[in-house]
Amino acid sequence: MTMLLDNPIWSALSGPHANLSMGDERARRYDPDFTSLAAVAPGADLSALDAIASLGTIGICTTSEPHIPVGWQVLEQFAVAQMVCDKLIDRELPSYVILADADVPEMTELVKLTRPGPFARRTREFGTFIGIRDQGRLVAMAGERMKIDGHDEVSAVCTHPDYQGRGYARGLV
């Protein structure tokens, strides 16, 4: 099971999210309306992404320093922590609502304000997104993005700055 997490984007795109992927047996990406994430199969070179990279900026995740193909430009590079929850902690859950398509404009505004990571026009369609509202206003949210056999990525975890420190993000996760 952990081997799937060694190349999580590929595992999702060639597994449970194959229906959302574009590409072939060497390289796949999500439709840019969902996210910019892309991956290559184990052992494949990043140049395998050339054909599908033309659809727009891509984001990759690697376990080692990648060899960047000639002509590519790195726009941003940062470390990512991958965590796995083996046991849920007993705690009182906050009162939350399930977010729907009608909530996307408000979700997008919260993401723009807090910058938890990529959130495209159709990201909400990856899975269930839940949120906390205060007097009708969306103040915190979290949702599912990549799905890998036995694992769901928790994504877009964010809380409006005026509501931070109340445990909303922890409760939603």
Residue positions per predicted region:
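N-terminal charged segments
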Residues: 1-67
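Short amphipathic alpha-helix that is part of the acyltransferase structural core
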Residues: 2-3, 79, 86-117
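Short, well-ordered beta-strand micro-motif
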Residues: 39, 82-85, 131-133
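A short, internal acetyl-CoA/4′-phosphopantetheine-binding micro-motif in the GNAT/acyltransferase core
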Residues: 39-41, 102, 157-165
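Conserved acetyl-CoA-binding loop-helix of GNAT-fold acetyltransferases
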Residues: 46-50, 165-173
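A glycine-rich, hydrophobic loop/mini-helix early in the fold
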Residues: 59-93
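A conserved beta-strand-loop-helix scaffold within acyl/acetyltransferase catalytic domains
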Residues: 118-128, 132-161
